[in-house]
Amino acid sequence: MGISLIGVEGMPLVGAGDDIAYLIISALNEGGEDLLDGDIIVIAETIVSKAEGNIISLEEIKPSPEALDIAERTGKDPSLVEAILGESSEIIRVGHDFIVSETRHGFVCANAGIDESNVDDGLATPLPRDPDGSAEKILRTLQEATGRELAVIISDTQGRPFREGAVGVAVGVAGLSPIWDRKGERDLYGRSLETTRVAVADELAAAASLVMGQADEGVPAVIIRGYPWGHLRSDGGVKPLLRPRELDVFRG
């Protein structure tokens, strides 16, 4: 099995009201590329939030007493801390230069997923309000425009407990199941797999992030071609990736 990662280059800076699907198709056409059946399009969450007008002006935020307290403990901008509080359902850990929280979507990550990169000074982008809904809307437009069978993943870059560095993860999914449950299959020695569940959407998002980059690469969307996901067709969204609170061994 061979998989290709194709960066969608030539996309303009995204602004409020832009149609992400249209921008992707236009950039592909300019580059002489077409979408094919089975392609998976991975899109950076930042441009989705920008297109949806989901932008935070830090200068307009008045920090609360809680934000001021956390800012003093972390060394972070009080306005940014207030924005993090607004996007969080729970603050889990704070320390010097870090805040780990659970977002309103159920993701546990740093800074509630708020990103200050690739936007103008004084602005920040939170995660899309409904990442699965955003992915579904983009998927529907792409499929109607091309007639192809596709899937869409909206990705974010997040850190992981006990490991350095950040990797791409899925925060929104449309068209495929984010989990491949392989329980009951046989390994190379004939033993039955008991617990193996593969986080396919996260693995695909991580692969795409190698092409997207984290700085000035200017590649906010990547086509993954050649991955056989026909057995994973689903409309269930990203929720299967989220570990239930009662099974969270880190928070108890």
UniProtKB/Swiss-Prot annotation:
Among NCBIfam families, the record links this protein to:
F420_cofE, PRK13293.1
| InterPro entries for this protein | F420-0_g-glutamyl_ligase (IPR008225), F420-0_gamma-glut_ligase-dom (IPR002847), F420_ligase_CofE_arc (IPR023659)
| Enzyme Commission number(s) of this protein | 6.3.2.31, 6.3.2.34
Its pathway is: Cofactor biosynthesis; coenzyme F420 biosynthesis
Q: Which GO terms describe its molecular function?
A: coenzyme F420-0:L-glutamate ligase activity; coenzyme F420-1:gamma-L-glutamate ligase activity; GTP binding; metal ion binding
Q: Which UniProt keywords apply?
A: GTP-binding, Ligase, Magnesium, Manganese, Metal-binding, Nucleotide-binding, Potassium
The Gene Ontology biological process terms listed for this entry are: F420-0 metabolic process
Question: Which SUPFAM superfamilies does this one have?
Answer: CofE-like
Question: Its domain of life?
Answer: Archaea
Catalyzed reaction equations: oxidized coenzyme F420-0 + GTP + L-glutamate = oxidized coenzyme F420-1 + GDP + phosphate + H(+); oxidized coenzyme F420-1 + GTP + L-glutamate = oxidized coenzyme F420-2 + GDP + phosphate + H(+)
> How does the cofactor attach, per the note?
Binds 2 divalent metal cations per subunit. The ions could be magnesium and/or manganese.
UniProt lists the family membership as follows: Belongs to the CofE family.
- Subunit structure, interactors included: Homodimer.
- Indicate which residues the UniProt annotation says bind a divalent metal cation 1: 115, 156
A Pfam family: F420_ligase
* UniProt protein name: Coenzyme F420:L-glutamate ligase
* Binding-site list for a divalent metal cation 2: 157, 214
The residues that hold GTP are: 11-14, 45-46, 50, 118, 212-219
For whether the record's keyword set contains Metal-binding, the answer is: yes
Give the source lineage, highest ranks first. Archaea, Methanobacteriati, Methanobacteriota, Methanomada group, Methanobacteria
Q: Which cofactor does it need?
A: Mg(2+); Mn(2+); K(+)
Instruction: Identify the Gene3D superfamilies for this entry.
Output: CofE-like (3.30.1330.100), CofE-like domain (3.90.1660.10)
Function noted in UniProt: Catalyzes the GTP-dependent successive addition of two or more gamma-linked L-glutamates to the L-lactyl phosphodiester of 7,8-didemethyl-8-hydroxy-5-deazariboflavin (F420-0) to form coenzyme F420-0-glutamyl-glutamate (F420-2) or polyglutamated F420 derivatives.
From what organism does this protein derive?
Methanothermobacter thermautotrophicus (strain ATCC 29096 / DSM 1053 / JCM 10044 / NBRC 100330 / Delta H) (Methanobacterium thermoautotrophicum)
